[in-house]
Amino acid sequence: MKVSVLITLAVWGVMFLLTSAQERGSDQMDSPAWLKSMERIFQSEERECRWMFGGCTTDSDCCEHLGCRWEKPSWCAWDGTFRK
């Protein structure tokens, strides 16, 4: 009997924590300030270069020693150089 009461109380506690965390998270996700800050983070960070066979539009999209090949679809390929 004591074990079943303890298990029931533990389950209620876990359910309370999960539901309160979900409610708190949904309030934060709907706020426009949160969305604006995330937008600023993604705009301000420097973009990585594209690796071999990655999609590209210009040579500057590709990593060093790679160039954008214009066949459809465009992709980054080795430009034939060995320099560092």
Curated annotation (Swiss-Prot):
Domain of life per record: Eukaryota
Molecular function terms, GO-annotated: ion channel inhibitor activity; toxin activity
InterPro entries: Huwentoxin-1
Tissue: Expressed by the venom gland.
Cystine residue pairs: 49-63, 56-68, 62-76
Signal peptide: 1-21
Transmembrane parts of this sequence: none
UniProt-listed Pfam families: Toxin_12
Subcellular compartments: Secreted
Keyword annotations of the record: Disulfide bond, Ion channel impairing toxin, Knottin, Secreted, Signal, Toxin
Propeptide: 22-48
One cellular-component annotation, GO: extracellular region
Family: Belongs to the neurotoxin 10 (Hwtx-1) family. 06 (F4b) subfamily.
Job of this protein: Probable ion channel inhibitor.
Domain statement: The presence of a 'disulfide through disulfide knot' structurally defines this protein as a knottin.
Name assigned to this protein: U2-theraphotoxin-Cg1b 1
